[in-house]
Swiss-Prot record:
Sequence similarity: Belongs to the NAD-dependent glycerol-3-phosphate dehydrogenase family.
A cellular-component GO term for this protein: cytosol
Gene, per the UniProt record: gpsA
EC top class named in words: oxidoreductase
EC number assigned by the record: 1.1.1.94
PANTHER family per UniProt: GLYCEROL-3-PHOSPHATE DEHYDROGENASE, GLYCEROL-3-PHOSPHATE DEHYDROGENASE [NAD(+)] 2, CHLOROPLASTIC
Protein name per UniProt: Glycerol-3-phosphate dehydrogenase [NAD(P)+]
GO terms for MF: glycerol-3-phosphate dehydrogenase [NAD(P)+] activity; NAD binding
Provenance organism: Shewanella halifaxensis (strain HAW-EB4)
Keyword Electron transport in annotation: no
GO terms of biological process kind: carbohydrate metabolic process; glycerol-3-phosphate biosynthetic process; glycerol-3-phosphate catabolic process; glycerophospholipid biosynthetic process
Gene3D superfamilies: N-(1-d-carboxylethyl)-l-norvaline Dehydrogenase, domain 2, NAD(P)-binding Rossmann-like Domain
Length: 339
């Protein structure tokens, strides 16, 4: 019993720990692996993740584990919650240690750095077609989820039984509502693009624009997300759900969002390096911006907001000039195929 679990979570940061807390609170024996032994030892001793979620106790059914082989042997259900730029590396380390009956789900939001490939493509490249895959996405702040505040997410996967099992594992009447979705591509894309738009919303607020401008950015950002999604074979309806509109509104409007705070700092005059230092944790949207920009260019999809956020982050353009360029774009119908 000691070395078995209902699910193993890879990634002991804020979101991985929050999901592990939710699973364990739901009565599931949950093993939580992290790559830093000292951090895992602190979790065991403190019975909380003071580095990322201070003051929130770890349930008795949550077992911190520093050894990857032990963690992966414990369960056939593996939930990967690591930043997108190390997803492939962690999966490569895990591959020789996986059980034959392993099933892989991730909560990583982003695309592969440099190439702009979906996480599913990275997973298939590393693992082949041997294992069922799934993704969970939606409007979630780790602190609220860990504290037991009501949250809703969506799950999509390559195997209907795996998706069904994940819904049953994660769903909790008191804290977490889980929706099954059949749009594997759409759920992955929403989690990446919303980070870019959230930086844009932060930039807008940082330079002194108000709620009107922020709302316009969210609305047109949803248009950009939908346009890119359809070009990749996703369903437009997905982006009106948890992984699209839901995640977009949450990330663009609340200062718990690192991406929004990053944009705010830039809008108020900080450079990229100083803004990242101010946040103190990984800002996924910084890399996501380059990834989404690369993908959009490759597919020939027009994404003006993404373009301007990219120019600010990677080309040194001032936030004010980026805003001016967006506002001075040629007038078009709101419902036309291009902005």
């Amino acid at each position: 019993m000691k070395n078995t679990a209902d699910i193993t979570v890879l990634g002991a940061g804020s979101y991985g720990t929050a999901l592990a807390i939710s699973l364990a609170s739901n009565g599931h024996r949950t093993m939580l692996w992290g790559h830093e032994p000292e951090h895992i030892e602190n979790l065991k001793n403190d019975k909380s993740n003071e580095a990322f979620l201070p003051g929130i106790p770890l349930p008795d059914l949550l077992i911190p584990e520093a050894d990857l082989a032990t963690a992966l042997a414990a369960s056939n259900n593996v939930l990967v919650v690591v930043p997108s730029h190390v997803f492939g590396l962690v999966l490569s380390q895990a591959k020789p240690l996986l059980r034959k009956d392993s099933r892989i789900v991730w909560a990583t939001k982003g695309l592969e750095p440099e190439t702009g490939r979906l996480i599913q493509d990275v997973a298939r490249e590393v693992l082949g077609d041997e294992y069922p895959l799934a993704v969970l996405s939606g409007p979630t702040f780790a602190k609220e989820l860990a504290a037991g505040m009501p949250t809703a997410i969506s799950i999509a996967g390559t195997d209907p039984q795996f998706t069904k099992d994940l819904v049953e594992l994660l769903h909790s009447p008191k804290r977490l509502r889980v929706y099954a979705n059949d749009d594997f591509i759409g759920l992955q894309l929403g989690g990446a693009v919303k980070n870019v738009i959230a930086i844009g919303a932060g930039l807008s607020d940082g330079i002194g624009f108000g709620a009107n401008a922020r709302t316009a950015l969210i609305t047109r950002g949803l248009v950009e997300l939908t346009r890119l999604g359809e070009a990749m074979g996703a369903q437009a309806s997905t982006f009106m759900g948890m992984a699209g509109l839901g995640d977009l509104v949450l990330t663009c409007t609340d200062n718990q969002s690192r991406n929004r705070r990053f944009g705010l700092a830039l809008g108020k005059g900080s450079d990229v390096e100083a803004a990242q230092e101010e946040i103190g944790q990984v800002v996924e949207g910084y890399r996501n911006t380059k990834e989404v920009y690369t993908l959009a260019k490759r597919l020939g999809v027009e994404m003006p907001i993404t373009e301007q956020v990219y120019q600010v982050l990677y080309k040194g353009k001032s936030p004010v000039d980026a805003a001016k360029e967006l506002l001075s774009r040629e007038q078009k119908s709101e419902t036309s195929s291009a902005e």
